[in-house]
């Protein structure tokens, strides 16, 4: 047993003994438990409360916005160069593309998934351009400037911009890989109920991760089915004269893919792809049927967009069901992995 003499209280001596895990002090037959243990407990409690107060704002931020991944400074500093707008940080460019390509009122996880796809495509373009950050000419029209965002969103500009910025920050530095290479990451608005197999569309085995995926909810979208009436050019009159018209009613769909999108169509003596026909006559989709109608051609389309990759509508529906962006991307891009852009930055 350890024994110690203390003169800590008013200069008077106390005989203290160590026992049962604490000091016991006696004076005049009355025991006094030494206060050091009590003080120590109070200090610990105060420290815990202080730690909670310091960390609480961070915890709330992570709960609302998700954790922010810190990437290498070189990746953060990557610049892209486009002709009319000069140089800008790659993440700033991605915000402009996200603003143009997906409605800002979509769910957070859908926006996050879209952000990863956009960043991946931008780095693919940088690699293909030789790594100096110069983007192809068409990239000029693929993003919105601040002026365009303000024009489109009006009073909701600040709110919408913050949402898109959060999507880029929540997925900071993340890109989609297939094996050792950046994946091709196409997306579109709305399917006919299924996405398309890239091999059927492009005739290449190059993208085995772009397969047919069910999107059952897409068929319930308001703009799933659209109808366009095409007039024969020679018959156009009045206000319709000069608008896009078809050369002849002698039109035949010659080939479709396994989910119903047109691969080949004949218009008179000319044969073109379904996507060419869609673009020429400004159709929502190359999944369409044809029907003569009072000397005109009625074209009924299903879905919106080319149909390859991620259906934004289904991605948003998945996000509404609390599915995260990683699960969304895995659903549409089979066999791919999300990796850090730092794994390729040395080659950029």
Segments from the language model and where they lie:
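Conserved, single-site charged/polar hotspot
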Residues: 5, 9-348
